[in-house]
Amino acid sequence: RERQVGRSRVISGNPESPLFSPLREILLVVAGPVALLSEAFGKIDGVERAFIYGSFAARARGVDGSAPNDIDLMVVGTPDASAVYEVCRAVEKSVARPINPTILTPDEFAAQSGFLESVRSNPILPIIGGDL
């Protein structure tokens, strides 16, 4: 599908196509926040695990809903918080969405809480450390 916006032509994928979901996931990994955050967080000491959760991860995994306004990021470890926020601000400029990091120690992440149970029971996009 395409449409004109001023002098630009905007092209979007057809969600009814069987190729839509696989192509969306490929683009998300190679050119989206997953790739940018993976590269940036690889340079920060103390990060054991990092992943995108919330509505952005859900839409990327094919869960229906409204388009996400921001990116929720879970960082597990003992990184320098200012380095985490600095990386998030830099990546925000490229993805044109605010990134909201939550930083937890490994013990805090292992604890049982309603918030963490919700995070664990919904789709994620791994950045560092793989799936939950």
Where are these regions (language model features)?
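Active-site glycine-centered loops adjacent to acidic/histidine catalytic or metal-binding residues
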Residues: 54
